[in-house]
Amino acid sequence: MGRVRTKTTKRASRVVIEKYYPRLTLDFQTNKRIVDEVAIIASKRLRNKIAGYTTHLMKRIQRGPVRGISFKLQEEERERKDQYVPEVSELEKDKINVDQDTKDMLKALGYDSIPTVVVAASRPERPFRYRH
């Protein structure tokens, strides 16, 4: 069974990561020294728990965004992804190929005036074969 981390440990680790992300690494010993420098922690055991959870979160951050932690680099990455505009829109097509049945359904619904809908040549249906 694993150990449960307290709210104090988790909150302290998140704050340390948000403020000092560029200085932290994936190494526990390095993170332990950084946590010792930047925070006043009452006991050695609590410092080690915070450093351990910080290292754990840093490894998770390497794989992707972590819920509850936002730092400048992650915000910039999210902004860049949100602002992306493709060169060719998927919504604006020159023509849409449909079969005759679909064209008839569009006509019945009153959408027969769409200029981009083109009836594609229907393929001859192959007879269904059973596997023996």
Swiss-Prot record:
Cellular location(s): Cytoplasm
GO terms for biological process, alphabetical: cytoplasmic translational elongation; ribosome biogenesis
GO cellular component: cytosol; cytosolic small ribosomal subunit
Annotated positions of the Phosphoserine modification: S43
Keywords, in A-Z order: Cytoplasm, Phosphoprotein, Ribonucleoprotein, Ribosomal protein
Miscellaneous notes: There are 2 genes for eS17 in S.pombe.
NCBIfam families, A to Z: PRK01151.1
Protein name: Small ribosomal subunit protein eS17B
Protein species of origin: Schizosaccharomyces pombe (strain 972 / ATCC 24843) (Fission yeast)
